[in-house]
């Protein structure tokens, strides 16, 4: 199973602010990110919902030839918070399917039990760019 590294970036306190996140794609044009129900990330999104998500795939350092193989993509869009309870629970189930697929029943119980301690961010993307370097 591949777990991509990702960083959600936004503007906070007049400057750039990036945090590592777990995300799940909804199969269309949005991703969901889970977080605590309060904090700097949510405050920043309330002030300016325009964000980017940088996703880093496979990275291989090739020291013998002084280069690195990599793949990455950056997505730009608008973040939405204060989603309906139904959408939040659907997002939590998508995250469980992605991150804990072998524990769906337990994940469902946990999602219901901790629902009040979780916020969900939906990011709707408007554009993206990707880059890859593969050495032959």
What are the roles of these predicted feature ranges?
Residues 2-3:
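Short, small-residue-biased leader/transition segments that mark boundaries at the very start
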Residues 6, 21, 31, 51, ...:
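A broad, low-specificity signal marking well-ordered, structured residues that form hydrophobic/aromatic
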Residues 18-20, 38-40, 107-109:
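A generic local structural motif
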Residues 18-19, 33, 81:
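A sequence-level detector of short linear motifs
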């Amino acid at each position: 199973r591949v777990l991509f590294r990702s960083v959600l970036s936004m503007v906070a306190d007049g400057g750039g602010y990036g945090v590592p996140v777990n995300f799940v794609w909804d199969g269309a044009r949005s991703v969901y990110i889970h977080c605590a129900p309060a904090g700097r990330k949510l405050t920043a999104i309330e002030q300016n919902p325009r964000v980017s998500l940088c996703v880093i795939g496979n990275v291989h350092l090739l020291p013998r030839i002084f280069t690195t193989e990599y793949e990455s993509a950056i997505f730009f869009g608008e973040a939405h918070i204060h989603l309906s309870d139904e959408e939040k629970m659907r997002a939590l189930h998508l995250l469980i399917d992605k991150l804990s697929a072998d524990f769906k029943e337990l994940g469902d119980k946990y999602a219901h039990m901790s629902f009040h301690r979780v916020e969900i961010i939906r990011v709707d993307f408007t554009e993206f760019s990707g880059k890859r370097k593969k050495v032959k």
